[in-house]
Design a protein with these regions (language model features):
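Transmembrane-lumen/periplasm boundary regions of multi-pass, lipid-linked membrane glycan transferases
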Residues: 102, 108-109, 260-261, 265-271, ...
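Membrane-proximal lumenal/periplasmic loop motifs of glycosylation machinery
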Residues: 89-100, 114-138, 157-160, 342
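Membrane-interface alpha helices of multi-pass inner-membrane proteins
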Residues: 239-255, 266, 380-381
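Start-transfer (signal-anchor) and selected internal transmembrane alpha helices
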Residues: 1-86, 290-300
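Transmembrane-helix motifs of polytopic, lipid-linked glycan transferases
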Residues: 55-58, 156-184, 222, 354-361
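Signature aromatic-anchored transmembrane alpha helix within multi-pass, membrane-resident enzymes
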Residues: 9, 70-74, 191, 241-245, ...
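Short acidic/glycine- and proline-prone juxtamembrane loop motifs at membrane-interface regions
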Residues: 202-215
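Membrane-embedded, lumen/periplasm-facing catalytic core of multi-pass transferases
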Residues: 430-505, 616-619, 623-638
Length: 639
């Protein structure tokens, strides 16, 4: 046995250790179901397996990281740790909506595994059709389980659960792109390219806000590494399995990564077809045909297997009207999206991209920038058929933009001797600028925090004010006072709760419920308001609530015309004296005053119809979310 082990490579020994660990986990899970140690140990094993998979992908892709690369990796991780520690510690951010979803999923996953091992795995698998799957929580439990389990802790722990594998694969991608671009000055190229990519603000943006969606980039980078220089000239079964696994992984992370997968596959197939046509014209017809046949066979088999593997998700996608339900988020289609992309990328990055395009044209190396450009355009066109992107959805375009950045980095590195000081200043200034960008829910243009706070145009003064309020809260004490009042006046055992009308980035029910994570003080005592057509149902809980909370001025932070909470609030204010009396008010210290209204008369059909009639347009589009919900509630209450 010792002789067999000694013959294994270092990576082989790692996989042998992982197999032994998996066997030990199985035995432990069967012997001690419900143990509080099982889920953290499972998460630790998954992270180790993912890191080993990353190393295996690098080897299959023909990329070897030497001591120089490893030293840069360790240094970058250390800088990232300091950055996260400083950035998270210098703000007071309240996690809500999408920013709290994964944290709550982590709590729920822990609770499920605390019941039993089987219950935990069922919880993970049952989410496959949801917008947020439980795939990421499987990896983020360790070391989150060792922390105070606050929102900031969850963001910081991604340094250990996400960043190591991500950095290793990004380093490999930088090297692979350098091979394709035939870079000679490899060390300068790696320093510039790797640092440029890793400091790109929208790489870390969602992670800083408690959304570990950048986890999907681990699998996206795997896919790029395995395919960028592979042309199906020979059959490579291990590579095919890794490509399939990477594709499944990126889709399981977040469903909208499918737009990247489709866009990249289209661009890759187009590249392969063009290269095969060129081969055929050069007299290598048989080689070109073999390429295309292998591509077609692999593509069909992989697509069929993927549909079977993700059949529940496929059924959900085919049976759900995403364009209709998410129309609220479609602000202006492809035209507005191109403008948004330009603002997010910024002038400094576009200068680099321009240098890269000039470099690729001069060296007659069009494949990489063309592949990236086609992937970006295809993904943009597909995504904007449903909606426009938020800052976290920018992640699905990151692989394409990074390939363009790397092409520009090659141009800088190869010509570093000319205008050396100017180029080094440009590089250093861009890194400092990128690291200073504020990662806020309202970030539209990638600007440092000091630039946002002192932006000279009066036209954006309201944006600056709201950005400050939402990113670094100054009203945490006031929010806690509201929480304490609701907690004291609502008895959950009697079914008493409050309903909050505001549903906005400035104020919403999530901020009050999750203001002191991991403690959820108002569990079952605060209901959320209606806001997004196609997403939120007619709020029948409003008619059951003991108290209703609203605010003056009513929060409406850059909402679209179809937003519903403002309309509901206007209806409430016009008729509240018939059913409510004022119970309390709270000055939030920033110009907003919350008022609590206590219901004095039980809801009747006339009151329900008063609100329902005001949403006739929404009812015509989504009757199952409005009139059917209202009628069902009325029937259930004998009205």
């Amino acid at each position: 046995m010792n002789r067999i082990v000694s013959r294994l490579s270092a990576l082989g020994k790692v996989w042998l250790g992982l197999a032994a660990g998996a066997l030990a986990l199985i035995v432990f899970g069967l012997a001690a179901p419900g143990s509080g140690l099982f889920f953290p140990l499972l998460s630790l094993w998954c992270n180790a397996a993912l890191f080993a998979l990353a190393l295996l992908v690098l080897r299959r892709a023909g990329v070897e990281l030497d001591l120089f690369h490893k030293a840069v990796l360790v240094g970058v991780w250390a800088v990232a740790a300091l950055y996260f520690f400083w950035a998270l510690g210098s703000r007071t951010f309240l996690y809500y909506w999408d920013y709290v979803n994964y944290i709550l999923k982590q709590y729920n996953a822990e609770a499920a595994f605390a019941q039993s091992t089987g219950a935990g795995f069922r919880f993970l698998l049952d989410s496959i059709t949801e917008d947020y799957t439980n795939f990421i929580p499987l990896f983020t439990e360790f070391p989150f389980c060792l922390s105070g389990k606050t929102g900031d802790d969850y963001a910081f722990c991604q340094l250990f659960s996400v960043l190591p594998s991500l950095l290793v694969l990004l380093a490999g991608l930088v090297c692979k792109a350098g091979q394709l671009l035939r870079v000679k000055n490899t060390r300068w190229y790696f320093l510039i390219g790797f640092s440029w990519c890793v400091t790109f603000p929208f790489l870390r943006m969602s992670a800083m806000l408690g959304q570990p969606d950048w986890f999907g980039l681990i699998f996206a980078f795997m896919l790029l590494l395995l395919t960028l220089d592979y042309r199906f000239d020979r059959i490579d079964l291990p590579r095919y399995l890794l490509i399939f696994a990477a594709t499944a992984g990126v889709i399981l992370t977040r469903r909208w990564y499918l737009y990247f997968v489709v866009g990249y596959c289209f661009a890759y197939v187009l590249l392969l077809v063009v290269s095969s046509v060129r081969l055929a014209k050069s007299g290598q017809q048989s080689r070109a045909v073999r390429r295309l046949v292998r591509l077609a066979v692999f593509g069909l088999c992989a697509a069929g297997a993927m549909v079977l593997l993700l059949l529940p998700m496929v059924r959900k996608i085919l049976g759900f009207d995403y364009a209709g339900r998410y129309s609220y988020y479609n602000f202006g289609g492809i035209t507005l999206e191109l403008a948004a992309q330009a603002l997010r990328i910024g002038l400094l990055n576009f200068i680099l991209i321009g240098l890269g395009l000039w470099f690729a044209a001069k060296r007659r190396l069009p494949a990489l920038p063309c592949l990236a450009g086609v992937e970006l355009l295809t993904s943009l066109l597909l995504f904007t058929r449903v909606q426009n992107t938020g800052s976290h959805q920018m992640l699905l375009f990151v692989p394409g933009w990074l390939l363009l950045f790397l092409t520009g980095s090659a141009a800088l590195a190869e010509g570093i001797r000319k205008h050396r000081k100017l180029k080094l200043f440009y590089w250093a200034f861009t890194l400092v600028f990128a690291m200073s960008v504020r990662c806020s829910p309202l970030t539209t243009v990638a600007l440092p925090g000091f630039a946002v706070d002192h932006f000279p145009l009066k036209a954006v003064s309201e944006f600056v004010r709201l950005d400050k309020l939402t990113y670094d809260r100054t009203d945490a004490a006031q929010i806690q006072r509201v929480d304490d009042w609701i907690d004291a006046h609502c008895d959950a055992e009697k079914g008493e709760f409050a309903y909050m009308i505001p549903h906005d980035m400035l104020y919403n029910s999530d901020m009050f419920q999750y203001a002191a994570l991991p403690d959820i003080q108002l569990q079952g005592k605060l209901a959320a308001g209606i806001s997004i057509p196609g997403t939120h149902e007619f709020p029948v809980r409003f008619f059951e609530a003991k108290y209703v909370l609203t605010a003056e001025p009513f929060p409406q932070t850059f909402v679209s015309g179809g937003e519903l909470s403002g309309r509901w609030n206007a209806l409430f204010c016009a008729a509240r004296d018939e059913h409510f009396t004022q119970a309390a008010s709270f000055d939030m210290g920033n110009g907003t005053v919350f008022t609590v209204w206590e219901r004095t008369e039980p809801a009747d059909r006339a009151e329900v119809e008063y609100y329902l009639d005001a949403f006739a347009q929404e009812d015509a589009l989504y009757p199952e979310m409005f009139s059917q919900v209202a009628e069902s509630w009325l029937a259930g209450h004998g009205l």
